Amino acid sequence: MKGLVKNREFMNMGKFFNIRKLIAATLLFAPALASAQESAVSTSALPFLDRTHGAVRSSMSGLGTVSDDAYSHWGNVSAAAFSSKTFHAGVGYSLWQPSVTKASVTDFGALWPISERWAVTAGVSVAAYPIEHRMDEYGVALSDFRPMDAVAGAGVAFRIIDCLSVGAAFNWAGSRGIDSELDAFAADVNLTFRKYGVNVTAFAKNLGTAVKSSDRQNFALPMSAGLEAGYGLNFGKSSLYGAVQGQCWLGGPFGISPSAAAEYSWNNMIFCRAGLHYGAKKNGLPSYGSLGLGIHLYGFSLDLSWNAALGAMKNTFACGVGYSF
């Protein structure tokens, strides 16, 4: 019996070391993937991979160091290793760029700490666009078609020491348009430091090889890398958190986008959030401001966000509900 227990322990240790190797390999090959894409292509594909998921991050202009919730998979998977919850899941809806793309987006995310230092994440996001009308070469109407984008994946996070964690998320992305179909696999990697109210995250997003279209053209994934830093203060029942982020775009034209956000909470129940994001015009990324509210009570959460802008992000709206225990 003792031998059986020891064998199981060795098997579990082997699994953990394999996951560490997978994360390390992703971090190691990240620069190579970036340079390969930049040398192969100059136009990025699957831009929806950069969409902000979850009403909390939407209301903070995409900043995610504070997010160790159900949507950690999408923003900062390494933060999942710091979660104090046993399980956290959430579902959300977003009306994305209603004056331009008019996309209806449904998001799902989950976080599960499986041990004191390990956590796993999962996420699914589906965007549906307005119906397009098909016609043949003679102008005769055919069946209608609804373009769709989807992303689904899983991630893992490991707390190396009490204040430092690493994580990686692996996603499949697919796009179905009226004249094209694209599929790709992409990885996100994060390294997070958290101590004395300070949060610092280094990240690389959408790492992967070039996407080939049906007409054999190569397109880069919208890869980016950046650094985010935040600090939180508590005074009585109130708390205040602020963060700044710098992000550079590597897939396609090079661009830089700075962001800043703040969150006020009372008794960890009522939340008010705001953020500003300066876009990278070369990459087609607009600038916008964001506002949001949240109510968290008895494990349940309700969060809302709204974006203000002169361009594509004008009146983008997101809402989400979640449960944790």
Annotated model-derived regions:
Residues 1-49:
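Cleavable N-terminal export/targeting peptides
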